[in-house]
């Protein structure tokens, strides 16, 4: 277990309700507690409990344990709601995790189970849409009305804002990772040549290992090898950039965003990602408006901050209801 010290949590959320927040990822999950003046008092990070068909039950049980730990450490805080973000396809209206290729659940009633475990109302959403809301309200996407926030990590997905409103498409919008960009590797969704199977951080490392027989620690290792002239690493990185640029060109043609904000682990490559990606995108586009490509600014805690914001929204909405 790792806990982020409060001095590192520098995004005040403002006055509002005290809440709990949970961000479930494919590798790790985070839990946070926020007080009524918007201070993020604690963030706890633990491995996501992977247990086959029982993974969703294990996740909810772990949420309960983390909540108890946070409340023990901060006994004066009385959360009025919680926010829960999970990966995969979600039905926000009914609180259901419809399908997760990477974690294996199907039609799981996350909101009901989490509310039963925590004893407070729960706002339920998709992990990238939640992180996107944090970037839109508090981060690099804040200056824009029409903007896409894209996360490139274990998978690839996005949050779409049109005229300042998050567009969810019934829980299915923003699945850029499962658009076809090449005749290529099989994806966990069952398709072939999906962007996620070519250009996600996990895919870059996996493709290099398959091409060379050498196990690497991650996409950063592949980028480092490419910078040193490793031909296989260079080819894999170049193909990932080509696929990303093609996918972004489709996004631009369809939505004409003012900006595309990129977060997730791969965004940490910095100029090695953004400069060649911008050149490739510019080469594809013709008459289209060219969006700014920006690095997400909130960092690795964007998801759990987004979950906290959504939990506060839930409290406010219920208070305002007739």
What are these regions (language model features)?
Residues 170, 175-186:
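Immediate flanking context of iron-sulfur cluster ligation sites
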Residues 95-106:
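A charged helix-plus-loop insertion that forms the helical arch/lid used to bind
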Residues 126-129, 133:
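Glycine/small-residue-rich loop that forms an oxyanion/phosphate-binding "nest" at active or ligand-binding sites
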Residues 1-81, 91-94, 112, 116-122, ...:
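ATP-binding/phosphotransfer module of carbohydrate and carboxylate kinases, centering on a glycine-rich
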Residues 23, 83-87, 149-155, 159-161:
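Short beta-strand segments
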């Amino acid at each position: 277990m790792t806990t982020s010290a409060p001095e590192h949590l520098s995004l005040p959320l403002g006055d509002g309700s005290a809440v709990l927040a949970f961000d479930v990822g494919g590798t790790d999950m985070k839990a946070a507690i926020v007080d009524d003046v918007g201070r993020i008092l604690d963030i706890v990070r633990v491995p996501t409990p992977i247990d086959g068909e029982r993974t969703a039950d294990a996740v909810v049980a772990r949420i309960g344990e983390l909540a108890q730990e946070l409340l023990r450490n901060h006994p004066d805080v009385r959360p009025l709601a919680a926010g829960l973000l999970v990966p995969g396809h979600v039905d926000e209206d009914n609180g259901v995790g419809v399908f997760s290729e990477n974690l294996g659940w199907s039609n799981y009633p996350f909101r009901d189970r989490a509310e039963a475990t925590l004893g407070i109302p729960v706002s339920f959403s998709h992990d990238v849409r939640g992180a996107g809301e944090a970037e839109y309200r508090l981060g690099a996407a804040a200056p824009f009305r029409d903007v896409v926030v894209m996360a490139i990590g274990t998978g690839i997905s996005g949050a779409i804002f049109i005229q300042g409103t998050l567009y969810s498409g019934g829980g299915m919008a923003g699945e850029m990772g499962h658009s076809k960009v090449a005749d290529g590797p099989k994806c966990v969704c069952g398709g072939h040549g999906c962007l996620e199977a070519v250009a996600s951080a996990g895919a870059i490392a996996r493709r290099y290992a398959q091409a060379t027989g050498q196990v690497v620690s991650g996409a950063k290792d592949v980028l480092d090898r490419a910078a040193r002239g490793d031909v296989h690493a260079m080819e894999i990185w170049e193909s990932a950039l080509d696929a990303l640029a093609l996918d972004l060109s489709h996004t631009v043609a369809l939505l004409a965003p003012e900006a595309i904000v990129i977060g997730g682990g791969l965004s940490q490559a910095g100029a090695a990602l953004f400069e060649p990606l911008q050149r490739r995108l510019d080469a594809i586009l013709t008459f289209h408006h060219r969006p700014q490509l920006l690095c997400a600014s909130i960092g690795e805690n964007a998801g759990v901050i987004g979950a906290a914001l959504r939990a506060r929204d839930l409290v406010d909405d219920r208070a305002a209801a007739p």
